[in-house]
C-alpha cells in the first residue's frame, strides 16, 4: 500500500486518482483531458492499478481481456498476463490484418468504427472489456456488441477513469453491461 509523506498509508484508489494529470483545454477549449501517462510513468502507481484490476477479476473465470484501441491497449494486456488469460485487441477500422467484424458508433461530432478479428473468441468465452476512460460509452458499447456477435459473454466493462457527467457509464449499465472504474472525475 502506498504511504503519504508522513508515512501514513494511503487509500489505493485515492493514490491512483492523485497520479492522473488534468490538462485543461486539450484537445480543444473547454475540455479537461485526464492524462494517464503520469500514472503509467510511476512503477508504484502502475503496480497498484494492475493489482486493483487483478484482485477484482482473479476469480471471474475469464478467457480473455479485450482492450479498446488505443489506450485500452496499455493496461488490458498487462491485466490479461497477470490473470493468465488471452488478450483481444479491438481496433480502429483498417488496422487488423485478418478477416474482421466491424461496429460503427456515434461520436459527439460524427461517427467511428471499431473492428475485431472474426476468430478472436468463441461462443461462451468469458471476457471483460477495458479502456482507460469511459466518457460517452460509445466505444465500449461498440466493443461489447462485437464480442457478443462472436458469441462471447461480456462479463463487465472496466476502465481506470469514469467521467459520469458525460453519461457513458450509465448508458452502459442501462444496456445491461456492468461497469467497474477505479476512479472518477466530475465534468468533461
Curated annotation (Swiss-Prot):
User: Which pathway does UniProt place it in?
Assistant: Purine metabolism; AMP biosynthesis via salvage pathway; AMP from adenine: step 1/1
Q: In the UniProt record, does the keyword Transferase occur?
A: yes
Instruction: State one molecular function term (GO).
Output: adenine phosphoribosyltransferase activity
Q: Which UniProt keywords apply?
A: Cytoplasm, Glycosyltransferase, Purine salvage, Transferase
Its cellular-component GO annotations read: cytosol
Task: Identify the InterPro entries for this entry.
Answer: Ade_phspho_trans, Adenine_PRTase, PRibTrfase_dom, PRTase-like
Question: Per its UniProt entry, what is the enzyme's top EC class, as one word?
Answer: transferase
What EC number(s) does its UniProt record assign?
2.4.2.7
> What are the subcellular locations of this protein?
Cytoplasm
Q: Which reaction does it catalyse?
A: AMP + diphosphate = 5-phospho-alpha-D-ribose 1-diphosphate + adenine
Q: Which GO terms describe its biological process?
A: adenine salvage; AMP salvage; purine ribonucleoside salvage
Is the keyword DNA repair in the record?
A: no
Family assignment from sequence similarity: Belongs to the purine/pyrimidine phosphoribosyltransferase family.
- Function, in words: Catalyzes a salvage reaction resulting in the formation of AMP, that is energically less costly than de novo synthesis.
State the oligomer form and interacting partners.
Homodimer.
Which NCBIfam families does the annotation name?
apt, PRK02304.1-3, PRK02304.1-5
Official protein name in the record: Adenine phosphoribosyltransferase
Origin species, per record, is Burkholderia lata (strain ATCC 17760 / DSM 23089 / LMG 22485 / NCIMB 9086 / R18194 / 383)
Q: What is the lineage of its organism?
A: Bacteria, Pseudomonadati, Pseudomonadota, Betaproteobacteria, Burkholderiales
Q: Which gene encodes it?
A: apt
Amino acid at each position: 500500500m502506498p504511504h503519504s509523506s508522513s508515512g501514513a498509508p494511503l487509500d489505493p484508489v485515492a493514490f491512483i486518482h492523485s497520479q492522473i494529470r488534468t490538462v485543461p483545454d486539450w484537445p480543444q477549449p473547454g475540455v479537461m483531458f485526464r492524462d494517464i501517462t503520469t500514472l503509467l510513468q510511476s512503477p508504484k502507481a502502475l503496480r497498484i492499478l494492475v493489482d486493483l484490476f487483478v484482485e477484482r477479476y482473479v476469480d471471474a473465470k475469464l478467457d480473455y481481456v479485450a482492450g479498446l484501441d488505443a489506450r485500452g491497449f496499455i493496461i488490458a494486456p498487462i491485466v490479461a498476463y497477470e490473470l493468465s488469460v488471452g488478450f483481444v485487441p479491438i481496433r480502429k477500422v483498417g488496422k487488423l490484418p485478418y478477416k474482421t467484424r466491424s461496429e460503427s458508433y456515434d461520436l459527439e461530432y460524427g461517427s467511428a468504427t471499431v473492428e475485431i478479428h472474426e476468430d478472436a473468441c468463441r461462443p461462451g468465452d468469458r471476457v471483460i472489456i477495458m479502456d482507460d476512460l469511459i466518457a460517452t460509452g460509445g466505444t465500449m458499447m461498440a466493443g461489447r456488441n462485437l464480442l457478443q456477435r462472436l458469441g462471447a459473454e461480456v462479463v463487465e466493462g472496466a476502465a481506470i477513469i469514469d467521467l459520469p457527467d458525460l453519461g457513458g457509464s450509465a448508458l452502459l449499465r442501462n444496456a445491461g453491461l456492468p461497469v467497474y472504474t477505479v476512479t472518477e472525475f466530475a465534468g468533461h
